[in-house]
């Protein structure tokens, strides 16, 4: 029970067994005092300091149960009817000896009548909690920050212990390394290893008289050229947009990858021609032992390069944060991601969340196409090295089977060409402004059509500026009574959260405007009406 008094100061500490009395000092000349009944199952003397951050207008009974296994065990029964927006701080010193005295110093804004129910926000800090309704489970040090607002939701941030944070810092720095830097470092390291080994292969292939080894060395030469080209493309793609290149130079990466693929195809054609010549005109003796040693070393180097480039391409990058975001509805359960059909315009005055913050959805890793093209080169070299090892083993055991050398060259040349098909398709898809393969146009159109107030979706175009940078333009026809700004906000939210498209151009149209708009073309000009001459009116009748 709480008694509110205006324009007078009361401080009434009361000490009762199994009862606690609160004295409240309010700076805004609104005062109240209330008694709380506690059932404490604690025979120990504990001194606790509880700091809460509340924003409320409140009049409440506390009737809830907490069982904390850190410094004390007690039962509190609290009944909360939360609906408040006020800020107050509790400095409570509790003596648990079945007789409790509570001194509370509050700075609040209270504008309520007696016996009025309140809704409030809580800020809790639990150290090492294992049990309880809001503890995260597990021992050790665990911090919780809770914000409960009037049944509309709550946010939880669960942080790990300080020791865990210190231990995970180097790993997090490695994971969070800028993708561009990671790609550049991987290319430089792979380029250095490849150059050193290429020189060794050229010398070894010359003395072994092996076309397969010389073929592998030639592949390494194209790898080096492709890596230099990739580094140049990455450098120029970082240049800002200009007046003549409004999208910037992002597609330089795509051009570099395309040229790299064409280099592989050209070199493979030359090697196939040489292999056919060796089949028709067999060479002199081939040293299978030297071939095997060099091919084994080549395979080892290529595997190292492949691991480095796969790491640098960022194809499986993950971002692991230390916190969790939850939203709790009126029923108290966790509210999952809204379904597409529920993202409707139910409230004209609703707020649209900031989608660019740190708590937004983590994007899945997008691989760097230049590093990936170099990775394809190295992967082809791995196949080539395996082929050389097979041929060298055959020639080592049976020296007269020299034909195994060009045959393996032909077989693995075809395999190398096969590894470039996907990269070639991706490069051409971006240059031809095709729809990104991970996005379904019909699904996007259906999601936009489900927005309440949208009557039609047309002129939908989706393309990629470069890999991982999709763009979209669309026309949305809406009802005349709907606010266009709300439709625009909801459409952008759907596109960003579900499809990770943040470069959008959305045109909102009313029905009259839509009638003049056609897909993919402007309305044709209206034909001019022909004037019909009337001879009877132009010349007087003959008499």
UniProtKB/Swiss-Prot annotation:
GO terms for molecular function: metal ion binding; zinc ion transmembrane transporter activity. Residues 1-186, 238-251, 311-375, 424-543 are cytoplasmic. GO terms for biological process: defense response to bacterium; zinc ion transmembrane transport; zinc ion transport. Residues 130-140 have a biased composition (Gly residues). The chain crosses the membrane at residues 187-207, 217-237, 252-272, 290-310, 376-396, 403-423. It holds the Pfam family Cation_efflux. Residues 56-66, 76-104 have a biased composition (Basic and acidic residues). Residues 208-216, 273-289, 397-402 are extracellular. Residues 1-175, 319-342, 516-543 are annotated as: Disordered. Residues 11-26, 41-55, 105-116 have a biased composition (Low complexity). GO terms for cellular component: contractile vacuole; pathogen-containing vacuole; plasma membrane. It is found in: Membrane. It is a multi-pass membrane protein. Keywords: Ion transport, Membrane, Metal-binding, Transmembrane, Transmembrane helix, Transport, Zinc, Zinc transport. May be involved in zinc transport from the cytoplasm to either intracellular organelles or extracellular spaces. Belongs to the cation diffusion facilitator (CDF) transporter (TC 2.A.4) family. SLC30A subfamily. This is Probable zinc transporter protein DDB_G0283629.
């Amino acid at each position: 029970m709480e008694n509110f008094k205006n324009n007078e100061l009361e401080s009434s500490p009361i000490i009762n067994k199994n009862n606690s009395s609160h004295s409240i000092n309010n700076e805004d000349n609104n005062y109240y005092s209330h008694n709380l009944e506690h059932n404490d199952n604690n025979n120990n003397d504990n001194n606790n300091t509880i700091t809460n951050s509340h924003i409320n207008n409140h009049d409440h009974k506390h009737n809830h149960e907490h069982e904390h296994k850190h410094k004390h065990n007690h039962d509190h029964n609290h009944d909360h009817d939360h609906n408040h927006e006020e800020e107050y701080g509790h400095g409570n010193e509790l003596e648990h000896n079945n007789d409790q005295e509570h001194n509370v110093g509050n700075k609040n804004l209270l504008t309520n009548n007696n016996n009025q129910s309140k809704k409030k926000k809580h800020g809790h800090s639990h150290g090492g909690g294992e049990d309880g309704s809001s503890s995260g489970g597990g021992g050790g040090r665990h911090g919780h920050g809770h914000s409960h607002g009037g049944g509309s939701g709550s946010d939880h941030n669960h942080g790990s212990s300080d020791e865990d944070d210190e231990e995970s810092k180097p790993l997090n720095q490695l994971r969070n390394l800028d993708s561009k830097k990671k790609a550049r470092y991987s290319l430089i390291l792979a380029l250095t290893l490849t150059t050193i080994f290429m020189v060794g292969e050229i010398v070894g292939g010359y003395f072994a008289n092996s076309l397969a080894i010389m073929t592998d060395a030639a592949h390494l030469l194209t790898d080096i050229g492709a890596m230099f080209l990739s580094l140049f493309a990455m450098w120029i793609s970082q240049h800002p947009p200009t007046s003549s290149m409004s999208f910037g130079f992002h597609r330089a990466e795509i051009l570099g990858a395309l040229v790299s693929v064409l280099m592989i195809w050209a070199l493979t054609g030359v090697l196939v021609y040489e292999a056919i010549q060796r089949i028709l005109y067999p060479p002199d003796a081939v040293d299978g032992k030297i071939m095997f040693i060099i091919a084994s070393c080549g395979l080892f180097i290529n595997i190292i390069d492949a691991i480095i480039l796969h790491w640098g391409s960022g194809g499986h990058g993950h971002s692991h944060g230390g916190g969790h975001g939850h939203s709790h509805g009126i029923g108290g359960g966790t509210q999952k991601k809204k379904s597409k059909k529920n993202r409707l315009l139910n409230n004209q005055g609703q707020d649209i969340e900031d989608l660019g913050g740190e708590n937004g959805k983590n994007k899945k890793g997008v691989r760097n196409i230049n590093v990936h093209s170099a990775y394809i080169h190295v992967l082809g070299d791995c196949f080539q090295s395996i082929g050389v090892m097979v041929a060298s083993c055959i020639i080592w055991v049976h020296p007269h089977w020299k034909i195994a050398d060009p045959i393996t060259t032909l077989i693995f040349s075809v395999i190398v060409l096969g590894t470039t098909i996907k990269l070639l398709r991706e490069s051409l898809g971006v240059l031809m402004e095709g729809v990104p393969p991970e996005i379904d146009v019909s699904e996007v159109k259906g999601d936009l059509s489900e927005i309440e107030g949208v009557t039609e979706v047309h002129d939908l175009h989706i393309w990629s500026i470069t890999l991982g940078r999709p763009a979209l333009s669309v026309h949305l026809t809406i009802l005349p009574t709907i606010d266009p700004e709300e439709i625009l906000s909801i459409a952008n939210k759907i596109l960003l959260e579900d499809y990770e498209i943040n470069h959008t151009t959305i045109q909102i149209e009313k029905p009259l405007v839509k009638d003049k708009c056609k897909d993919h073309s402007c309305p044709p000009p209206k034909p001019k009406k022909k004037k019909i001459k009337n001879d009877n009116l132009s010349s007087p009748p003959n008499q």
